[in-house]
Amino acid sequence: MNRHLTGKQKFAFGFGAIGKDAIFNIVSVFLMFYITDIVGLSPAFVGVMLFVARIWDAINDPIMGMIVDNTRNNFGKFKTWLVIGTLINAVVTVLLFTNFDLSQTAMYIYISIIYISWGMTYTMMDIPYWSWLPNLTHDPREREELSVIPRFFASLAAFTVGTFGLFFIHKLGDIFGGGSDSTGIFVFAIICSLIFIFTIGVTVFKVPEDQEMEKLIGIKVKFKDIGRILFKNKELLAIMGVLLTFNLCLQTLNGSIIYYFKYVVNAEHLFAIFNSMILCEMVGLLLLPRFIKWVGRTAAFNTSIICIISGLLIILISGYIAPQSMTLIIIGAGILRIGSGFMVGITTVSLADVIDYGEVKFGQRNESIITSTNTFLTKTSQAVAALIVGLGLSILGYTPNEAQSVVTINGLRIMILVSPLVFICLAAFLYHKAFNLKGDFLTDIEKTLQYKRQREFRERIK
């Protein structure tokens, strides 16, 4: 009873990631910059605010996963919450980048409330989107190919927002606000939100939801079950560690690199060049399925680690020997992004394998609760990275829009490039020492699950 999707359906599912990740990246890349350089609030406040918001997410995200798993209607549990979450999050994103020119105290309160609301509504949409992926196909090879498509479109969104975001903000500010970046980022947020609604709409209306399988394994989940689902599954805990450390590597880099190019090497234009190398991440994602067939998933993972470390070292060294060299930035960022493309694809399909493992070992898939860990860890890494960057900038004596001291410049080098190196090495350690869904063990899980499916199907048609 293997289920297969048409090429158009695979494309439509992945297409939704364009808008979804455009929204994520405008917050990930520009929120710190917006709050510190446009609104004029403390960078330390931003770091602490994001970190505190994640404490709430630790409770909220698994509960949202439970709500999705327990939803039963004719529209489909994934589509229902995907639509609701998208519409609300689009509005909240616009509000997040709306500068009402309030007093400083009022702005601190406003930003805090709206950002926490943004995190909750993003969860409402992101969990059903990624929970849906493991149910779209049960064939392991097709799943590897399918997992790459939304990640490719997500990288396309990250490339567009990261590379051209500042240009759009400045240009829109000139057109609608007389040169005001505050107006520019507000209009940019509106555009991203409209794209978000459109692309998710294509996914919802073009991709069928497999409600028959939901009926087969549709055991109602209670709140008390969440702890067991999350903490009894050792493979889930292992991949959570890999996801957290990998995301911390990227988020620390993404959240601070704009300061590096602007103040350390005095070449702000290199920020756009650096972000344009997300094209290489897209290439890495496209190459990944064939590369895995050639060398295996573990070797592909090792290749990704080597590429990320090599890219970071090239950028670090270039900052000393040729600070404004576009060529070295292109080479370093390009190698790094090929590695991150491999890593994103591998972790996505690995989380889907964990859902299969949970069904074999515990008799329940719990797609949304398990996938909620990915959403939570992504936001957690964003918050921890913002905390590192925000507190780091304050400790180093960073002053916006002014020349920085030697201490600040050297501190920025360490924070921006050495921290990601530490995090990616931790990710490699956890994948090799704690995560076991590889090789023969994964093959055994796939065969056991296929037998289980066939038995359940025969019993159902009797």
Swiss-Prot record:
Keyword Hydrolase set for record: no
Keyword Cell membrane set for record: yes
Gene Ontology annotations of biological process type: carbohydrate transport; sodium ion transport
Domain of life (superkingdom): Bacteria
Keyword terms: Cell membrane, Membrane, Sugar transport, Symport, Transmembrane, Transmembrane helix, Transport
InterPro entries noted in UniProt: MFS_2, MFS_trans_sf, Na/Gal_symport, Na/Gal_symport_CS
Pfam family, one: MFS_2
Main location: membrane
Membrane protein topology class: Multi-pass membrane protein
Entry's Gene Ontology cellular component terms: plasma membrane
Record PANTHER family: MAJOR FACILITATOR SUPERFAMILY DOMAIN-CONTAINING PROTEIN (PTHR11328), MELIBIOSE PERMEASE (PTHR11328:SF36)
Name this polypeptide is given: Lactose permease
Top-level taxonomy: Bacteria, Bacillati, Bacillota, Bacilli, Bacillales
